[in-house]
Structure formats: structure tokens, C-alpha cells
Design a protein with these regions (language model features):
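Hydrophobic transmembrane signal anchors and adjacent membrane-proximal interface regions, especially
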Residues: 194, 227-229
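Edge beta-strands of jelly-roll/beta-sandwich modules across compartments, strongly enriched
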Residues: 254-266
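Extended extracellular/luminal ectodomain segments enriched in beta-structured repeat modules
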Residues: 184, 192-199, 243-244
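Short loop segments at secondary-structure junctions
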Residues: 194, 221-222
């Protein structure tokens, strides 16, 4: 069967909470070719639809007969349409627009398929190249300075086999897990001196399932950001702040939360 799910639109819009565990009927509800690149005229309305804003919350999956692992793919184009037209050379998405889409898709448990049409000579047009190059620079700047190792990290709870240090060891197959029975937890990073921070990246250990539903990031007692699901990756950006104690509060989880990835950037 299909292994990736159309996000439900081709404008780059992403859900607030993008779950990879969804009702199995979505596989048949959204044969992408039959709905993609067509007007939303109501013909495809059904009990659950790929265009619905909520397709994976507890309320939605509670009555599902079967659940499947069906991650989202955000599809959009760098241009107004899917093919090259010279008159659109002045209407290419800017690097800032593309960055917002990247952070909302890749940074919120989805993959991103960005259409970049070749011109009539089989080349990528100069305006597209310029926008993409600037996008690459912006992404590199966000993740240029990883300050995680400067902090001492602790968690309110953990099972012995999976301490919090395994969330920051850079290994793909190790992870932190909260103590059995815990559906919320708090992780604290203490820096030896005030450290400028503007971004936190989280990732769950997906072989044990997508679990985290919501959380908050606090900087020295002030809330810096809120987030919903984590999944493969959650990129949390906020106004740069000088902080000595950074706190990540997992406020709701479907069972004991896990993290295979925790990175803090300046």
C-alpha cells in the first residue's frame, strides 16, 4: 500500500499537529492522483479526508477500526504552478517563504517535496537558483552553532536502560524514555553561564511509536515557545534569549515519552 500521505493541499500549508498514526481508511480516502491538482469542489468529502485539519488526535482515532503508520508529505512548488513559464520569473517564492514552509513541514513531522520545474532549456531558471541558494544559507545559519554540549542535562524521570544522556549522544538508535507510567516529564539544561539560544530541535524514537502530544520550552522561568506533536522532528524557533536554565516540558504524551534527539542552537 501507499507509504506516504498527501498533506491535503499543494499550497505548502501544514497542520498544527501532524500525526503519522492515522485511521487506515485514509489510504483509500486519498488516492493522491485522483485528488491532487484538482479544485476542491466537495466531490471527495467523506468521513475522514486528507484535507481535514485533524486526522490523528485521540478524538479522531478513538473510533477507528484500524490504525496505520502513514507519515505526511507536504507538496508545493517554488513557482505559481508546476511547470516553467518565463512570465513567472518575477513570481518565484522568496527564501523567507521557502524557509517558513521548510520549518512548518520538515520541522513539524512531515517530509517536503518542493517542485522546481526546469526551463525550456532543461535548466533551473536563475531566479529559482537564487532563491534556493539563499534558502540553503538561511538553514545553515539556523543550525550553525549547536550549544547542547555546553549544558548539563537532567530529566525528572527515566528508565535505567534509557537515561536522558542518550537523547544527546548523537546516536540514531539510542534514546531517553520517561519512567513507566509517566505521560509528562521535564528536561532541564543548565549552562555554566548565560547562553544565547533561539532554537530547539526534538525527535522521538519512532520504532517505539509517536507519543508526544504537546510541550513547552521555558528560558529562565519565562515561556519561550509551545509545540504540539514531535514525531521524526520538531524544530522550535523563538526570539533569541540569553538563558542559563533551559527547560523542556512535555505536557502530554500517549504513553511514556521518548526522545532520540535533543539539540539546542544559538
Amino acid at each position: 500500500g501507499p507509504d506516504v500521505r498527501w498533506c491535503g493541499n499543494e499550497a505548502g500549508h501544514c497542520r498544527k499537529a501532524e500525526w503519522s498514526v492515522v485511521p487506515a481508511e485514509l489510504r483509500d480516502a486519498e488516492r493522491t492522483a485522483s485528488k491532487s491538482q484538482q479544485a476542491d469542489d466537495g466531490e471527495f468529502s467523506r468521513k475522514i479526508d486528507s484535507q481535514d485539519e485533524d486526522i490523528g488526535s485521540r478524538a479522531v482515532i478513538r473510533n477507528a477500526r484500524e490504525l496505520v503508520w502513514y507519515p505526511s508529505e507536504v507538496d508545493t512548488s517554488i513557482r505559481t504552478g508546476w511547470f516553467y513559464h518565463p512570465e513567472e520569473d518575477t513570481d518565484v517564492r522568496t527564501a523567507d517563504e521557502l524557509l517558513d514552509i521548510y520549518l512548518d513541514a520538515v520541522g513539524a513531522n512531515a517530509s517536503l517535496l518542493l517542485n522546481i520545474p526546469p526551463d525550456t532549456h532543461g535548466r533551473i531558471a536563475a531566479p529559482d537558483c537564487a532563491s534556493l541558494a539563499e534558502l540553503g544559507t538561511k538553514i545553515q545559519q539556523i543550525f550553525a552553532s549547536n550549544v547542547t554540549e555546553k549544558a548539563k542535562i537532567t530529566a525528572d524521570s527515566a528508565i535505567a536502560q534509557h537515561p536522558i544522556t542518550q537523547a544527546v549522544d548523537g546516536m540514531a538508535d539510542t534514546y531517553w524514555q520517561a519512567a513507566y507510567g509517566q505521560e509528562s516529564d521535564t528536561i532541564t539544561l543548565k549552562f555554566p553561564k548565560p547562553q544565547k539560544v533561539s532554537c530547539v530541535v526534538l525527535g522521538e524514537h519512532l520504532p517505539t511509536g509517536q507519543r508526544i502530544e504537546s510541550g513547552e520550552i521555558w528560558a529562565d522561568g519565562s515561556k519561550a515557545a509551545e509545540f504540539t506533536v514531535v514525531g521524526h522532528k520538531r524544530i522550535c524557533r523563538f526570539t533569541p534569549v540569553d538563558v542559563q536554565t533551559l527547560t523542556i516540558k512535555i505536557t502530554a504524551s500517549r504513553t511514556e515519552p521518548t526522545l532520540r534527539l535533543l539539540e539546542v542552537y544559538q
